[in-house]
């Protein structure tokens, strides 16, 4: 699949249900095309009507072209259908995105069209991967009506060409709540640009996280609110009217609901504040009044409330820190970490208050605070070959240990060690792993004989933060999947990582989206790279480690390191 297509393949079918509510179209019926479904601020495109005397192949081509209508509307496409087919065609259930149209096959009155470089999304807009060869062939039945060919049977899908998506859809996030209610969790989608953007975001948010995410995330929005009654943006205020019942919502749930809306709607640059009503009645939120700012809810930040972008490293076995700017010195941290302890692979929590490191023989873990009175202790873990640890915002320290049977996944919470079985990860040859700060995503690199794989699993927890189970690991697509040898991985956002591989004297960086939609963001460095240092915090630079240098592959920024420095990392 071409990477340009892959970038936008998570586009949502949310608009389709709105687009479907248009006048029925028959062969000679006059349609009202002056009330488009989405007022997009782009050059309008009004596809032409079926040409008199058009062949079956030309009718199918016109039908597919009509789905490029701008502003978005399915009314144009329905003109190519018979009256009955136009009434029954239900494209909202599936969205197909294709790179190019392949060959036509015609055996009157049927036309088959092959979609090349195609992928699909389900009715919720969830990326489901590429289409199998058999699924990429669309069959259309045609009949003559009043002497003209019209489509009598068409696939129930919105079939969209990739360039149209590149212009009209933007990657966005919906924000839900992890089970403890302390942190928001972003779920990536693509939403149509333009005046309907806020409505689409709220509609998507109200659709909920889905049954497959039960135990991973939840929503604090009121039950019964499957669709917004209305979303109107006036003078920077988004007036959101929902259906539903708030009688079971205490102060904490109301705050979470406001945070979900604020974080989701702040992506719309036209929205500054939100005014919420339920069935037309104003909702007064504790501490906010009858409206609240889109910058509200900072306490639920997926990256943590005290997240910094300082760098940490080991220097002679002692922990040091620096802002990472040119000329800024590396200084020892406070407490016992300022002394040498013969450790490797250090990890600092998101608050910058506690660190953990693997012992030099990789069988144990040292943990301790970074305050002046910080003391070091040993985590309740005895391993064989422990990998670099990872923290989440709850204070869980995640570990992977490897022995002859493969990988074991566990976390340390206080004085407890808890094992977590992750199908597709446990027992495999894990070489690198990451856990998202919100504690809902586990990413691993699994080494193979000819190539490595990158997989992601979602972690399920109780309301008290106990991890219960994990979903089966899902393979994440990569353009070099057949030959990829991953040197390292790191966060670039709460929903994306970067994977680096060394190809000769060139380091190749590939962004990987954790929703499974491939990404086209790809860049290189003409250096030998041994690791990558990244953070989900937007203001953090991405660094590659090369000798005694940190190299920014995006800005070509070069930070020289002291020769006795190792294990450079961000916190979190």
Spans of features found by a protein language model:
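Bimodal "functional hotspot" detector
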Residues: 6-8, 13, 17-572
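Positively charged n-region of N-terminal signal peptides that target proteins for export
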Residues: 1-4
């Amino acid at each position: 699949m071409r990477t340009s297509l892959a970038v936008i393949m998570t586009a949502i079918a949310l608009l389709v249900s709105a687009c479907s509510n248009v006048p029925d179209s028959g062969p000679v019926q006059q349609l009202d095309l002056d009330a488009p479904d989405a007022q997009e601020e782009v050059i309008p495109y009004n596809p032409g009507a079926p040409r008199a005397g058009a062949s079956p192949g030309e009718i199918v081509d016109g039908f597919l072209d009509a789905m490029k209508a701008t502003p978005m509307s399915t009314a144009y496409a329905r003109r190519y259908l018979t009256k009955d087919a136009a009434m029954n065609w239900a494209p909202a259930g599936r969205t197909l995105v294709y790179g190019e149209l392949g060959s036509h096959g015609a055996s009157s009155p049927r036309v088959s069209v092959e979609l090349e470089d195609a992928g699909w999304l389900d009715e919720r807009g969830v990326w489901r991967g590429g289409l199998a060869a058999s699924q990429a062939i669309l069959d259309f039945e045609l009949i003559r009506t009043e002497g003209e060919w019209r489509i009598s049977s068409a696939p129930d899908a919105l079939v969209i060409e990739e360039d149209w998506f590149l212009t009209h859809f933007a990657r966005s996030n919906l924000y839900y709540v992890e089970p403890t209610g302390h942190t928001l969790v972003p779920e990536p989608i693509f939403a149509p640009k333009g005046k309907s953007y806020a409505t689409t975001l709220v509609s998507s948010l109200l659709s909920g996280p889905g049954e497959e995410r039960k135990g991973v995330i939840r929503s604090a929005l009121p039950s019964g609110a499957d669709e917004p009654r209305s979303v109107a943006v006036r003078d920077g205020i988004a007036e959101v009217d929902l259906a539903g019942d708030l009688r079971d919502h205490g102060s904490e749930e109301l705050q979470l609901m406001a945070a979900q809306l604020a974080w989701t709607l702040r992506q719309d640059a036209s929205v500054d504040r939100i005014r919420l009503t339920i069935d037309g009645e104003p909702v007064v939120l504790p501490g906010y009044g009858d409206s609240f700012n889109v910058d509200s809810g900072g306490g639920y930040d997926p990256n943590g409330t005290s997240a910094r972008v300082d760098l940490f490293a080991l220097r002679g076995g002692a922990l040091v820190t620096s802002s990472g700017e040119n000329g800024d010195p590396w200084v020892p941290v406070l407490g016992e970490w300022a002394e040498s302890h013969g450790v490797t692979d250090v990890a600092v929590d998101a608050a910058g208050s506690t660190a953990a490191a693997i012992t030099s023989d990789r069988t144990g873990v040292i943990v301790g605070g970074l305050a002046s009175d910080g003391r070091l202790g040993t985590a309740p873990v005895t391993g064989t070959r422990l990998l670099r640890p990872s923290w989440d915002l709850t204070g869980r320290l995640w570990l992977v240990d490897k022995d002859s049977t493969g990988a074991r996944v566990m976390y340390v919470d206080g004085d407890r060690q808890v094992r977590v079985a992750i199908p597709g990860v446990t027992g495999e040859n894990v070489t690198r792993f990451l856990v998202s700060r919100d504690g809902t995503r586990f990413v691993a690199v699994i080494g193979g004989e000819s190539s490595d794989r990158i997989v992601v699993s979602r972690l399920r927890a109780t309301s008290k933060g106990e991890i219960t189970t994990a979903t089966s690991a899902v393979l994440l697509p990569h353009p070099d999947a057949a030959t990829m040898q991953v040197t390292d991985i790191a966060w670039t956002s709460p929903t994306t990582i970067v994977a680096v591989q060394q190809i000769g004297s060139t380091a190749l960086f590939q962004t990987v989206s954790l929703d499974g939609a491939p990404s086209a963001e790809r860049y290189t460095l003409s250096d030998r790279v041994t690791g990558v240092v990244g953070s989900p915090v937007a203001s953090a630079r991405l660094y590659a480690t090369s000798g005694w240098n940190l190299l920014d592959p995006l800005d070509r920024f070069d930070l020289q390191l002291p020769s006795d420095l190792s294990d450079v990392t961000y916190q979190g």
